[in-house]
Amino acid sequence: MAEVAEVAAESGGGGDSGVGACERGVAPIKAQYRTTKERFHEYLDADKQEGACQETPTEGPAEPEAKRIRLEDGQENGKTEVAVESHERQVPKRARGQNKSRPHMKPAHYDKERLCPSLLQESATPCAFGDRCRFLHDVGRYLETKPADLGPHCVLFNTFGRCPYSMTCRFAGAHLGPEGQNLVQEEVVARCAQLPSVRNGLDRALQQQLRKRQVCFERAEQALSHLTQGPMPTIAPESTVATLTPKHSSCHVQLDNVGGDGARQGSPVPTCGPLTDEDVVRLRPCEKKRLDISGKLYLAPLTTCGNLPFRRICKRFGADVTCGEMAMCTNLLQGQMSEWALLKRHPCEDIFGVQLEGAFPDTMTKCAELLNRTIDVDFVDINVGCPIDLVYKKGGGCALMNRSAKFQQIVRGMNEVLDVPLTVKMRTGVQERVSLAHRLLPELRNWGVALVTLHGRSREQRYTRLADWPYIEQCAKVASPMPLFGNGDILSFEDANCAMQTGVAGIMVARGALLKPWLFTEIKEQRHWDISSSERLDILRDFTHYGLEHWGSDTQGVERTRRFLLEWLSFLCRYVPVGLLERLPQRINERPPYYLGRDYLETLMASQQAADWIRISEMLLGPVPPGFVFLPKHKANAYK
């Protein structure tokens, strides 16, 4: 080991990188690839055009050694915290964690003059707003100010045979005729019409009803009335029929309307198709659709990064179960289009669920009933693990673990109105040394939860220590026979194998999928994949294609795709290629030092600077618009 350290020092491995072969908390990269911060950025800047600015972004001091050791020493005492506090008094505090006050540029900001949708839809009727329309109606003026196309091929036109964005598409040259008409490939359109499409969209009529509060939640009100009358009995196969009061019984109302002699003389009610009693008799637990996913690979519901294009990437690499991003029940009940977009399901997602966040039984139960009759999912998950203050201070997320009475009402209420299994994702607890999961798991089993996913960290802990898999093993025994999935620190097939030995029913992959979405392939094939930089770029290119299909190919769609690509790159840059490591596998808590890859693209992908992520996005989506600003959500580094 001493010889390796000497070689590293001679090859420039010392200096700012400060990486030794055995340094704890740092990824063990081979000596011939390690370098310093200055040489790393000089190498990247050398490829830029002559005359470009070669400033090295300023960066705060490196993390103290004591703080890096805390990643592995879960039982560290409070001395390291005192050392860190004293260190921060001497030097300016470096921004870290979430960037809560980051500048947020909406994609519409980059499209100042937008064409009226009536012109895009090629409708025969004129614009309903007339002169009061705030959009542009002069096509010639729009084309004069429109930026140049980003490429010669339109993903939507090639995939679906028609681009609905017409002349506003940033690749419009691929499908505009000589007179500016939008071309259509009839054969491709006919073929795509027979294929399944993306589901779980929000209907405009339903959106208006939600905004005007005209939606009836009869089943939810019945369930809530049962909850207020007292504790409900434990759900068991013997409980068959939900009790209905006469005023809520549809059969009773019908008999009152046609009762007496007039009922015998009147004509029979015409029927069409089979008559069911789903509105009167709810499904028994044994009649509900079962969620049998034991042993399958579960992609975690990842806020911001777990969007539909990213889930398609993970499905292609072997993910079995997917779940939408966390959706707030109050926003869904208000008909917010952006929140309903989180529920969309691609046809490739064969086992798919949605995750709800809420703090009160009434809103959660009503939202569950709404989703039960409007969208197509295989399960509904309750978020009891969100640690952010915005959710926690309102009583949702992790706070539900300390509000067992409300938690019980939420679970029982939702379970009564849902026809699909109900699952829960939770943490070990709120405080770092006070675990609560082992106490709640038997209760959740009695309340009717079909499956629980346990993240082996508390709210206060966040990612400052390794996940507590021994505690997850203990909870798996307590939860039996209810299946329990484990989550935390899985970045290789060895990590997955060790996790399965704890007795869990399966594993959930979260950050590991962000760092390397091909992790699912590695787990299933039990091998390390030394993926090349060109293959990784192809994955990013596929993501941009999926993003343009999902968010659109106009300026707003392109910039929204770019934004989510950059957020993903803030995680992808932490991956260290297999061929560069001295020891396999890479640990998720090991910080990658400065290193030079086997080619320029591999080095560029290892950069932790947002300016370099922008360069990668420009390879795939063209140049950024003027005034572009990006500050990653989970990284203390900005590009302006």
UniProtKB/Swiss-Prot annotation:
Binding site for FMN: 301-303, 355, 425, 455, 487-489, 510-511
Gene3D superfamilies, per the entry: Aldolase class I, Zinc finger, CCCH-type
E.C. number(s) listed in UniProt: 1.3.1.89, 1.3.1.-
Enzyme class: oxidoreductase
Pfam families xref list: Dus
Position of the Glycyl lysine isopeptide (Lys-Gly) (interchain with G-Cter in SUMO2) cross-link: 406
Sequence positions bearing Phosphoserine: 267
N-acetylalanine: residues bearing it: 2
Biased composition (Basic residues): 92-106
CC cofactor: FMN
GO MF entries: flavin adenine dinucleotide binding; mRNA dihydrouridine synthase activity; tRNA dihydrouridine synthase activity; tRNA-dihydrouridine47 synthase activity; zinc ion binding
Signal peptide: none
PROSITE patterns: UPF0034, ZF_C3H1
Biased composition (Low complexity): 1-10
One GO term of the biological process aspect: regulation of translation
Catalytic-site annotation from UniProt: 386
Keywords (A to Z) from UniProt: Acetylation, Flavoprotein, FMN, Isopeptide bond, Metal-binding, mRNA processing, NAD, NADP, Oxidoreductase, Phosphoprotein, Repeat, tRNA processing, Ubl conjugation, Zinc, Zinc-finger
Role this protein plays: Catalyzes the synthesis of dihydrouridine, a modified base, in various RNAs, such as tRNAs, mRNAs and some long non-coding RNAs (lncRNAs). Mainly modifies the uridine in position 47 (U47) in the D-loop of most cytoplasmic tRNAs. Also able to mediate the formation of dihydrouridine in some mRNAs, thereby regulating their translation.
Protein name in UniProt: tRNA-dihydrouridine(47) synthase [NAD(P)(+)]-like
Species this chain originates from: Rattus norvegicus (Rat)
